[in-house]
A protein has these predicted regions:
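Active-site-proximal helices and loops of the catalytic beta/alpha 8
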Residues: 168, 178-261, 266, 315-353, ...
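Loop/helix patches that line or flank the sugar-binding groove of alpha-linked glycan CAZymes
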Residues: 52, 56, 260-412, 436
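Substrate-binding/active-site clefts of carbohydrate-active enzymes
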Residues: 2-22, 31-40, 46-170, 190-199, ...
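Short, solvent-exposed turn/loop segments enriched in Gly/Ser/Thr/Pro and often Arg
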Residues: 43-52, 110-119, 178-184, 207-211, ...
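Hydrophobic faces of well-ordered beta-strands that scaffold small-molecule active sites
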Residues: 9-11, 42-44, 107-109, 175, ...
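Short amphipathic alpha-helices and their capping/turn segments at secondary-structure boundaries
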Residues: 27-40, 97-101, 253-259, 295-302
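C-terminal beta-strand-rich structural cap/linker in extracellular carbohydrate-active enzymes
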Residues: 427-445
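Solvent-exposed beta-strand/loop surfaces of large extracellular or lumenal domains
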Residues: 416-431
């Protein structure tokens, strides 16, 4: 089955971080910027009514640690059918989706169906919509929130109607499913089949790794892409200097086996609302501009669906904590003023080139992948994508040292598409190159 994401690039938009106002109206004004930069799918973190319960016994450890002192965790739902006034109104969401569609952008909303807030709107009428402990209280999940009871057919119907509602009434193009592997498989199969009867082109992104539910794997294959935490973590380790290129290759082969060859349906990321909240230092500060660009080049040219967290296109270093907002402590909006500075101007132009490269080069999203031999296997992460006789070569030095090496490939006739810190020439059957720390080279026929 063809991948519905095709050559699309996902942009994760967290409203609290995306603009100082933190609203859908403010975000809508910047949609032309996303289109011009070359993004295709706008994934909105939850904008539904969040639980404002101040009982800290129902606050996650992460929320307490953040210091935001904000009970409204966007991933702790109070009402799945209402828009939180922090972000705007239902009319604002309709206008946002319509504006996105006018630009050719798709919009995904975030479904948080594993748990809910302790004051969820349905609890008074349907106390059996959540699991209970032996004492009759809430059964709490990993993050300390009441866990939904999928043994209850009425809950399933309530949530299936919720999925249909935002497709029918707002025209959204699909969903990202929070911790999707913790929700029963058969719930997703039925729910996604229902919304695809409304719109056959619905896009579904699973924040999980249920291989049997991946499109193309079985008759129950309903998710078009999965998160791949193992790859994300290994690439971060490589950029941090805690892993090398050999570890990256080993991880790719491990993932290929686990995903049964469907690694092309893995979201490729180096950051997200979770990572930005939890990691001690933003990648832009930890790796520098060259390191970030090296990692993005790898993820945009290897098999999979590129996934970019908001702000990377302007080299933002803001804290981006998901719990902080203009209404709480720790406001942290993207520094759009970077676009007045050389580093921001450069990154935006560079991101446009990278996104265009991904869109235009069919070997990236249709082709096979192999790893050519190099004389510096620990430092160089090199791979070839090939489709219908056309090749694309990516070489990235993931080490902190300059490297002189050979890559076993005949590169005569290949053109340079993107490069930084790399000098190269063809000598016989090998590409000889000198490449600086976190340098990269992309060539194509």
């Amino acid at each position: 089955m063809e991948n519905r994401f095709g050559n699309k690039i996902i942009y994760q938009l967290a409203p609290r971080t995306f603009t100082p106002q933190g609203t859908l109206k403010a975000a809508q004004k910047l949609l032309p910027h996303l289109k011009e930069t070359g993004f295709d799918v706008v994934y909105l973190t939850p904008i539904f009514l969040a639980d404002d319960d101040t009982d800290r016994s129902f606050w996650s450890a992460r929320l307490k640690k953040s210091g935001a002192e904000n009970p409204k965790n966007p991933y702790r739902m109070k009402d799945y059918y209402e828009i939180d006034e922090e972000y705007g109104t239902k009319e604002d969401l309709k206008a946002f989706v319509a504006a996105a569609h006018s630009l050719g952008l798709s919009v995904l909303l975030d479904l948080v169906y594993f748990h809910c807030g302790p004051k969820a709107a349905f609890l008074e009428e349907h106390p059996d919509f959540v699991r209970r402990n032996e004492a009759g209280g809430f059964a709490l999940g990993e993050w300390g929130y009441p866990v939904l009871n999928f043994d209850n057919p009425a809950l399933r119907e309530y949530l299936w109607k919720n999925m249909e509602y935002f497709v029918l009434e707002f025209g959204v193009d699909g969903y990202r499913c929070d911790v999707g592997q913790l929700v029963p498989d058969d719930f997703w199969v039925e729910g996604i089949r229902r919304i695809r009867r409304i719109n056959p082109d619905i896009l579904m992104l699973n924040e999980g790794y249920v291989v049997d539910l991946t499109a193309g794997e079985s008759e129950n294959g309903v998710f078009d892409a999965n998160y791949n935490f193992s790859w994300c973590n290994r690439l971060i380790e490589a950029m941090d200097g805690r892993a090398d290129a050999e570890a990256l290759r080993a991880q790719w082969f491990k993932d290929r086996d686990y995903y049964r060859g469907l690694t092309g349906k893995c979201a490729r990321m180096i950051d997200s609302h979770d990572l930005a909240t939890d990691l001690p230092t933003r990648n832009e500060l930890a790796w520098g501009s060259r390191g970030v660009e090296c990692a993005l080049v790898i993820n945009h040219t290897i098999d999979g669906v590129p996934f970019v967290f908001n702000g990377y296109e302007v080299a933002s270093t803001c804290a981006a904590c998901m719990f902080a907002s203009r209404l709480s402590k720790g406001e942290n909006a993207i520094e759009w003023s970077n676009l007045l500075l050389p580093e921001g101007k450069y990154r935006l132009a560079w991101m446009k080139r990278l996104n265009e490269l991904h869109h235009r080069q069919e070997p990236i999203w249709k082709g096979s992948l192999r790893f050519p031999e190099t004389t510096r296997e620990r430092e160089l992460f090199a791979f070839v994508r090939e489709y219908e006789g056309k090749r694309l070569l990516t070489v990235a030095n993931v080490s902190a040292q300059p490297v002189c090496a050979e890559v076993s490939i005949e590169s005569a006739g290949m053109k340079e598409l993107l490069a930084a810190g790399a000098a190269y020439r063809q000598e016989g059957p090998a590409l000889c190159l000198t490449i600086g720390p976190k340098g990269y080279l992309v060539l194509a026929d």
